Swiss-Prot record:
UniProt-listed SMART domains: LysM (SM00257)
Classification of source organism: Eukaryota, Metazoa, Chordata, Craniata, Vertebrata
Name of this protein: LysM and putative peptidoglycan-binding domain-containing protein 2
Phosphoprotein listed as a keyword: yes
Composition skew (Acidic residues), residue ranges: 145-156
Length: 215
């Protein structure tokens, strides 16, 4: 008969069968993974755009600071919250949050709406100041101010010659004294003319009267 007894157990400390272990994965280089992750995050930040109706915030690219400014919109007949949001490039939720509106039809309860608009403001790096230092903010604010165009005198067009408008002759102001003097002079001249005319008529009649007297 065959011996069916179990095989004797191996003694402790005895030789064990060597099991082949799975090969360990090669260590991941940290220097190569960090630039890839940074490039991936930067590309996601650039390609991520705001979709209409979403409440997700827009991630600004590196080296930029998001500034929120409000624009006043006058509500007119026929305006809709969707149309206003499309006009200014914002979401309806942002308009409702800024104006404390509960429904889309509440815009007609107000005469004007405050529209929040996000604008990106670049940061300046001069190698000495940090991003949040007051010096960099001062330089940044002065850099972002709109410069007025300077026009030299040579570029100015010559003034077009304009004919002076002929002004109507204003009547000469005459004082009361001058008026009375002129009136006296006219009366005096009229009197002299009448006297001269009377004398001439008398001289013409005198020869005719003398001839009648002698006849």
């Amino acid at each position: 008969m065959a011996d069916l007894s179990p095989a004797p157990a191996l003694r402790e400390g005895g030789p064990r069968a060597h099991r082949p272990s799975a090969p360990s994965p090669p260590p991941r280089s940290r220097s190569t993974s960090e630039p890839e992750e940074a490039e991936l995050s930067l590309s996601l930040a650039r390609t991520k755009t705001r979709s209409y109706g979403s409440t997700a915030s827009v991630r600004a690219p590196l080296g930029a600071r998001v500034i929120e400014r409000h624009v006043e919109h006058r509500v007119r007949a026929g305006d809709t919250l969707q149309g206003i949001a499309l006009k200014y490039g914002v979401t309806m939720e942002q308009i409702k949050r800024a104006n404390k509106l509960f429904t889309n039809d509440c815009i007609f309860l107000k005469k004007t709406l405050s529209i929040p608009i996000l604008s990106e403001k670049p940061l300046l790096f001069n190698g000495l100041n940090s991003i949040d230092s007051p010096e960099s903010e001062t330089v940044d604010s002065s850099f972002c101010q709109e410069e007025e165009p300077v026009v030299s005198e040579e570029e100015l067009p010559p003034p077009s010659p304009q004919d002076p408008d002929p002004k109507p002759a204003q009547p000469e102001e005459v004082s009361a004294r001058d008026f009375l003097q002129r009136l006296d002079l006219q009366i005096k001249l009229s009197t002299q003319a009448a006297r001269k005319l009377k004398e001439e008529s008398r001289d013409e009649e005198s020869p005719y009267a003398a001839s009648l007297y002698h006849s």
